[in-house]
Regions:
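Conserved alpha/beta-hydrolase catalytic His-Asp/Glu region
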Residues: 130-136, 143-197
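Catalytic histidine-centered segment of alpha/beta-hydrolase-like enzymes
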Residues: 232-245
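Conserved serine/cysteine hydrolase catalytic core
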Residues: 173-230, 237
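Active-site loop/oxyanion-hole signature of alpha/beta-hydrolase fold enzymes
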Residues: 40, 52-96, 246-249
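Conserved HGGG/HGGXW glycine-rich cap/lid loop of the alpha/beta-hydrolase fold
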Residues: 9-65
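Flexible "cap/lid" loop of the alpha/beta hydrolase fold
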Residues: 106-111, 115-148
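Gly/Ala-rich beta-loop-alpha elbow adjacent to hydrolase catalytic centers
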Residues: 97, 101, 105
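Glycine-rich His-Gly loop
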Residues: 27-31, 99, 207
């Protein structure tokens, strides 16, 4: 496992780097997730294996450190991922992100176009969302006060969703709450506004039982490919793993 300091206190972001051919592929997990749980089997699948692969645990998640004075905004995450890519001696990578990881991937591709050659996002938020106790996971988390979420809310959400607990227990409650606030707040310009003018190949993946994609017409008009996975919800890598792999492999196949 590799590590790199990402703040003035020496807090470390950590990742796995497996050898393979270029272009390298970088995978970014979602909120309260980990790299190996979200993408370990995906990246090692025969249809995707053979490329150099970076599986990054984002700050506050998994094996990475979780400083209490860090912002956990999308731009802050994107800056860390950019630093990891550069530390690995890479450029023009294929970037794949799920949920919050997809938001971060969009921001990174827009801020640092020199680092990204192809972009695949799976059910990433494209627009800011209001905190909402009945909304998406990030909306429910951000609706709670930070102190309340840290003291009781994070544990309560894990108790209500035992499957989610398997990765959430490896994450820091404060970091998860601030990350959720970052997701619903979004970027400036918005993720959609950053995504549309990009000139690299872009694919947006959604599950037919997952989150509603608002404004697909704007994506299609800008040349973003939209792929739907049948029988999959938001956690498509678990619901339909073979179809998820096939969709990513197709998105990362160079067009001739």
């Amino acid at each position: 496992m590799h590590e790199l300091a990402f703040d003035a206190h020496g807090s470390m972001v950590r990742w796995l780097d497996t050898p393979g051919a270029a272009p390298a592929r970088v995978y970014l997990h979602g909120l309260a997730g980990t790299a190996h749980a979200a993408f370990g089997e995906v990246a090692g699948h025969p249809r995707l294996a053979g490329r150099r692969t970076l599986l990054i645990d984002l700050p506050g998640h998994g094996h990475s450190d979780r400083p209490a004075d860090w912002s956990y905004t999308l731009d802050a995450f994107a800056g860390v991922v950019a630093a990891v890519i550069e530390a690995a001696g890479l450029a023009r990578v294929d970037l794949v992100g799920h949920s919050m990881g997809g938001c971060i991937a969009i921001v990174l591709a827009a801020r640092r176009p020199d680092l990204v050659s192809r972009l695949v996002v799976a059910e990433a938020n494209l627009d800011p969302l209001p905190p909402d106790p009945a909304g998406l996971g990030s909306q429910q988390m951000s609706y709670q006060a930070e102190a309340d979420f840290v003291q009781t809310g994070f544990a309560a959400m894990q108790d209500a969703n035992p499957g989610w607990r398997s990765t959430a227990r490896l994450c820091d409650a404060l970091a998860v709450h601030r990350s959720a606030v970052g997701v619903v707040t979004g970027s400036a310009p918005t993720m959609r506004e950053l995504l549309l003018p990009l000139t690299i190949p872009r694919t947006f993946i959604r599950g037919d039982r997952g989150e509603t994609l608002v404004g697909p017409e704007s994506l299609l008009a800008a040349g973003v490919r939209i792929k739907e996975i049948r029988g999959a919800g938001h956690m498509m890598m678990a619901d339909a793993p073979e179809a998820f792999v096939d969709t990513i492999a197709s998105a990362l196949t160079p067009e001739v």
